[in-house]
Amino acid sequence: MSMTDNVADMLTRIRNAYKSKLINVSFPSSKIKTSILDVLQKEGYIKDYVTTQKNNISYTEVALKYSVNGDASICEIHRVSKPGKRVYSAIKDLKGYYNNMGIYILSTPYGVMSDREAHIKNVGGEVICKVF
């Protein structure tokens, strides 16, 4: 069975893993997923991730991050732009998510980046997801 939205599947697996208090979560790998994980790692929402090969299929395993008292580092993670309804935004239209405590992840002509990095580079693009 083929999936229509691989990114939404990845975000759902991460969200469910945090709710279940898991240490790691794995899913099939792709370039866009790796780019999103780079942003999440750079912003401090996940510890690390590793891509491995099993039977000619590449999988990504993500090490989830928790605080000292066991709280998840991601409270909310939602898909914004979907295959049936793409959402694009100019950088001036992106306001801070949760009073700048959360981030939007954008796909821009310069690659996948957070809204903070997009503000610095003054570039807009497709809003992939929002994280808090």
From Swiss-Prot:
<dbReference type="InterPro" id="IPR047863">
    <property type="entry name" value="Ribosomal_uS8_CS"/>
</dbReference>
<comment type="function">
    <text>One of the primary rRNA binding proteins, it binds directly to 16S rRNA central domain where it helps coordinate assembly of the platform of the 30S subunit.</text>
</comment>
<dbReference type="GO" id="GO:1990904">
    <property type="term" value="C:ribonucleoprotein complex"/>
</dbReference>
<dbReference type="GO" id="GO:0006412">
    <property type="term" value="P:translation"/>
</dbReference>
<keyword id="KW-0699">rRNA-binding</keyword>
<dbReference type="InterPro" id="IPR035987">
    <property type="entry name" value="Ribosomal_uS8_sf"/>
</dbReference>
<dbReference type="GO" id="GO:0019843">
    <property type="term" value="F:rRNA binding"/>
</dbReference>
<comment type="similarity">
    <text>Belongs to the universal ribosomal protein uS8 family.</text>
</comment>
<dbReference type="Pfam" id="PF00410">
    <property type="entry name" value="Ribosomal_S8"/>
</dbReference>
<keyword id="KW-0694">RNA-binding</keyword>
<dbReference type="GO" id="GO:0003735">
    <property type="term" value="F:structural constituent of ribosome"/>
</dbReference>
<protein>
    <recommendedName>
        <fullName>Small ribosomal subunit protein uS8</fullName>
    </recommendedName>
</protein>
<dbReference type="InterPro" id="IPR000630">
    <property type="entry name" value="Ribosomal_uS8"/>
</dbReference>
<comment type="subunit">
    <text>Part of the 30S ribosomal subunit. Contacts proteins S5 and S12.</text>
</comment>
<keyword id="KW-0687">Ribonucleoprotein</keyword>
<dbReference type="GO" id="GO:0005840">
    <property type="term" value="C:ribosome"/>
</dbReference>
<keyword id="KW-0689">Ribosomal protein</keyword>
